[in-house]
Design a protein with these regions (language model features):
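A glycine-rich beta-strand to alpha-helix segment
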Residues: 49, 57-62, 138-163
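Glycine-rich N-terminal segment of FAD-binding domains in flavoprotein oxidoreductases
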Residues: 45-71
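N-terminal glycine-/serine-/threonine-rich phosphate-binding loop
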Residues: 18-51, 129
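Class I SAM-dependent methyltransferase SAM-binding "motif I" and its flanking Rossmann-like core
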Residues: 159-184
Length: 184
């Protein structure tokens, strides 16, 4: 199996700084709450922000918290743009195992995000190079990512970038380890 993966490109430091902050939490619920706090603050401070969103088991609790806050009237996603991290090649977006479906089930169908502002790699485009270029252009056209949510897999993979992969910039395809396929 192969997945299209976007790795944010470094931009001029005057334009954007990249900060990685490790926050220790006592458990999954605490992590979900704290991560939702960070995302909520970003949406409130910059209503037209670009969120880089992840899939898999890690963010489900985060998305539940964001939906709760939306339902309570605390968050407005109407101006938010999303650029998702990855998608399985060969799966149409309507397939229940696609990450398009995952994101709709867990977040998009429950908040007021504009469907025109939802971006994921196209898993049905079998011209991998063209799809990677197209998705990089989408990300450039929205001004880059303001906040990127990532999960770390049980084997250390991040956004389908396996531990042994070279850290290339931009959207690219990777071959997934069997363990990653089974876990996802």
């Amino acid at each position: 199996a192969c997945a299209a993966v976007h790795r944010p490109q470094r931009v001029n430091e005057e334009e954007r700084s990249f900060i990685v902050k490790i926050i220790r939490t006592k458990d999954y619920a605490d992590m979900s709450r704290k991560a939702a706090n960070i995302i909520s603050a970003q949406v409130i401070m910059k209503p037209d922000c670009v969120l880089g969103l992840a899939t898999g088991g890690t963010p489900v609790g985060i998305y539940e918290k964001l939906v709760e806050r939306y339902n309570e009237g605390d968050l407005d996603f109407s101006e938010v743009t999303s650029v998702n991290l990855d998608e399985y090649r060969g799966l149409p977006k309507e397939h229940p195992e696609s990450y398009w479906s995952f994101m709709h089930r867990n977040l998009f169908d429950h908040v007021n995000i504009d469907p025109a502002h939802i971006n994921l790699p196209d898993g049905t485009n079998m011209d991998a190079e063209a799809e990677c270029k197209r998705y990089d252009e989408v990300i450039r056209s929205v001004g880059g990512v303001d906040l990127q949510l990532l999960g770390i897999g049980h084997d250390g993979h991040i956004g389908f970038n396996e531990p042994h992969d070279a850290f290339a910039l931009g959207t690219h395809c990777v071959d997934l380890a069997q363990e990653t396929i089974e876990a996802n």
